[in-house]
Regions:
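Residues at secondary-structure transition points
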Residues: 29-37, 68-72, 76, 192-196
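Acyltransferase
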Residues: 189-242
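Phosphate-handling active-site elements
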Residues: 47-54, 82-92, 109-111
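DPxDG-like acidic metal-binding loop motif
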Residues: 60-94
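Surface "functional belts" at beta-alpha junctions
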Residues: 33, 88-196, 224, 229-230, ...
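N-terminal beta-alpha supersecondary unit
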Residues: 1-63
Length: 242
């Protein structure tokens, strides 16, 4: 059984994927209260799934990019649980999780070779970007073509054209819609998506476990992308956020 944690954005999410494919998931909008809500959410999920904590065989978490504080919450919780249970960790790109969610929920539009772009709001007038290609076999993991990288909203159209994107999702296209000026005649299908997808993280983690992609808890780490990981006191007082 796999437990997946996602605290990369203002939502807090957790999911349990059982060995038989059954899924249990909770997602809440918590702002910056991830550290308060994550573990109670996990306890509720374990009870709902009808298992014991010791039945978990893998702990997965969204590695980022995303909110720096949020990423540390999920990473720390995953490490602590994995150490206590003596199980491995799978760290999954939050951008890939969005692409995987799109792949799973838009079967009528996704084909082998379809290129999925993800643009998430990175604040400071930037987006976290990544690009994936759908493989021929449905059971295989998405093929990463690029990312995660930082892209200015004004450069989004160029980025999408460079990698010949077929579909696009992520919060960046909503937050910076005017600056992006993505052409409606460009053949790119834009899909609205929620921020948190612990279910997709769990499914990717299952593929990682089968291919030997898990790690020891002490090796788990957030992926920030941006080097600037903290605000000054003045910036915090002014209401700025990373």
């Amino acid at each position: 059984h796999i437990l997946a944690l996602d605290t990369a954005q203002e939502d807090c999410g957790a999911a349990i994927l059982l060995a038989d494919g059954s899924l249990f998931m909770h997602v809440e909008h918590v702002g910056s209260r991830h550290s308060e809500r994550l573990l109670p959410m996990v306890r509720d999920l374990i009870h709902e799934a009808g298992i014991e904590k010791t039945d978990l065989g893998l702990i997965a978490f969204g590695e980022g990019p995303g909110s720096f504080t949020g990423l540390r919450v999920a990473c720390g919780a995953a490490q602590g649980l994995a150490w206590a249970l003596e199980v491995p960790v799978a760290q999954v790109s939050n951008l890939e999780a969005l692409a995987e969610w799109l792949r799973e929920t838009h079967l009528e539009a996704v084909r082998p070779g379809t290129r999925i772009a993800v643009l998430n709001d990175a604040r400071m007038h930037e987006c976290y970007a990544g690009m994936w290609r759908v493989p021929a076999a449905a059971e295989d993991r998405l093929e990463r073509l690029d990312g995660p990288v930082l892209v200015a909203p004004e450069d989004a159209q160029t980025y999408l054209e460079r990698f010949k994107a077929d579909m696009l999702c992520g919060s960046g296209s909503k937050v910076y819609s005017e600056a992006m000026k993505i052409r409606s005649d460009g053949g790119i299908r834009m899909v609205n998506a929620a921020d948190s997808h612990p279910d997709a993280i769990a499914r990717i983690a299952r593929r990682m476990a089968l291919s030997g992609g898990t790690i020891r808890p002490e090796l788990a780490h957030p992926v920030y992308v941006r080097n600037r990981v903290a605000l000054t006191m003045a910036e915090r007082a002014a209401g700025e956020r990373l």
